């Protein structure tokens, strides 16, 4: 494979992958159906040299009722990165674990379970507290989590807080004469 487009053509012949989005010549993204993600990831690692899992992250598309997982892989020999995106329903946010393919994925999966509520059955230590010790509310990275309500219920007001509103502060910095 010499280009991302050639790699995409090969992947399309093997898996039902979506359109290729090229950010830069060395960085592209493709959407993969949930049920084909693991086999696509394994192929990319074993056959195409994408040996490094750079990151695993999520986006909460609240209005669409979806989570988007992005698995960013790197082929260090070729100096290229490929992101695989998979969409999950928010009300059934479960994805197969890939900790056996990339052991570091277990850490990312623990974080995503804790911060978004996405489940990765079989992932090691998945249900142990990771960052949010004693957390009882909905996962805080979900867009329906009310940060302001949580802050008001959890923290006391302190003097001077009302004078440090970021919008007011920036307005004073940018327009010191009140213009």
What positions do the PLM features span?
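Terminal low-complexity/charged segments
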Residues: 1-179
